[in-house]
């Protein structure tokens, strides 16, 4: 069993493995009280006035307390992050890293700007960690790249992956969870998808070209891979307990 887990971990692509490791180490550290979540959460005042710049990164690494929900989130993160890196971004590790960096920047900007707008500032002030939103962004982008994969929810109904973000949003509403986390992820995902996939087809220009200094960090082969019709099979569950599974077409 341990050998199988080790092999599974070693076979992960570099960005997925690094992000998953950082998230697990951070959350375990907080659980063991080695690190305090109060030193990790997003606080604009502390970032600007006290130069606690690390908060811009650490708020994407903490997934709250260690419990069954945490394990589901780690599975969810590992699955969709890996699917994107191995399929849509195969041979383009630098581009995938830039996607995550862009998404994190958009999410942080939304929270900072929203915190300055009357009537909704209190709502944004309660958003301390954006880790789940970044994961939801990955799901949104994956669903846009694989819109025709058939999925089922609890065996009650089937739908195509294009509607996966909306199904997950509906589930959050159903169980009484805050929808802001999901909505922010959808917004960031759509902004990226539009600028990276839609806008270039409309104008022939690509505004999100990965900077050369980021490309220099990764030894990528310039490979463009067409999406197979069953890309992502076995990748559909937000949480295994939800019964949200893809079906072969």
Swiss-Prot record:
One GO cellular component term: endoplasmic reticulum membrane
UniProt xrefs under Pfam families: DER1
Tissue specificity statement from the Swiss-Prot or TrEMBL entry: Expressed in roots, stalks, leaves, embryo and endosperm.
Cytoplasmic compartment spans: 1-21, 118-122, 174-249
Keywords (A to Z) from UniProt: Endoplasmic reticulum, Membrane, Stress response, Transmembrane, Transmembrane helix
SUPFAM superfamilies named among the record's database cross-references: Rhomboid-like
Chief location bin: endoplasmic reticulum
GO biological process, one term: ERAD pathway
Residues that span the membrane, as ranges: 22-42, 97-117, 123-143, 153-173
Ranges per topology, Lumenal: 43-96, 144-152
InterPro entries membership: DER1, Rhomboid-like_sf
Topology versus the membrane: Multi-pass membrane protein
Gene field: DER2.1
Keyword Iron-sulfur appears in the UniProt entry: no
Protein name: Derlin-2.1
Keyword Methyltransferase belongs to the record: no
Induction conditions: By endoplasmic reticulum stress.
Cell location: Endoplasmic reticulum membrane
Source organism (scientific name): Zea mays (Maize)
Something else known: Associated with ER-derived protein bodies in endosperm.
Family: Belongs to the derlin family.
Example GO molecular function: signal recognition particle binding
Domain of life of the native organism: Eukaryota
Function: May be involved in the degradation process of specific misfolded endoplasmic reticulum (ER) luminal proteins.
């Amino acid at each position: 069993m341990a050998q199988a887990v080790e092999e599974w971990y070693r076979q992960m692509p570099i960005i997925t493995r690094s992000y998953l490791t950082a998230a697990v180490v951070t959350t375990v550290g907080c659980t063991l009280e080695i690190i305090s979540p109060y030193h990790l959460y997003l606080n604009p005042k502390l970032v600007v006035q006290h130069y606690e710049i690390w908060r811009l990164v650490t708020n994407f690494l903490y997934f709250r307390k260690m419990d069954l929900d945490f394990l589901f989130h780690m599975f969810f993160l590992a699955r969709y992050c890996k699917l994107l890196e191995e399929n849509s971004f195969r041979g383009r590790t630098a581009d995938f890293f830039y996607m995550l960096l862009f998404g994190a920047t958009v999410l942080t900007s939304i929270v900072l700007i929203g915190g300055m707008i009357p009537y909704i500032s209190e709502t944004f002030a309660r958003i301390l960690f954006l880790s789940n939103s970044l994961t939801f962004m990955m799901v949104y982008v994956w669903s846009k790249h694989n819109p025709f994969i058939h999925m089922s929810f609890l065996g009650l109904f089937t739908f195509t992956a294009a509607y996966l973000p909306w199904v997950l949003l509906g589930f959050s509403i159903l169980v009484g969870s805050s929808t802001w986390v999901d909505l922010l992820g959808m917004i960031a995902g759509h902004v990226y998808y539009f600028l990276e996939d839609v806008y270039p087809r409309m104008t022939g220009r690509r505004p999100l070209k990965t900077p050369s200094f980021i490309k220099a960090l990764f030894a990528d082969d310039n490979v463009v891979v067409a999406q197979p019709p069953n890309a992502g099979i076995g990748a559909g569950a937000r949480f295994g307990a939800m019964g949200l599974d893809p079906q072969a077409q």
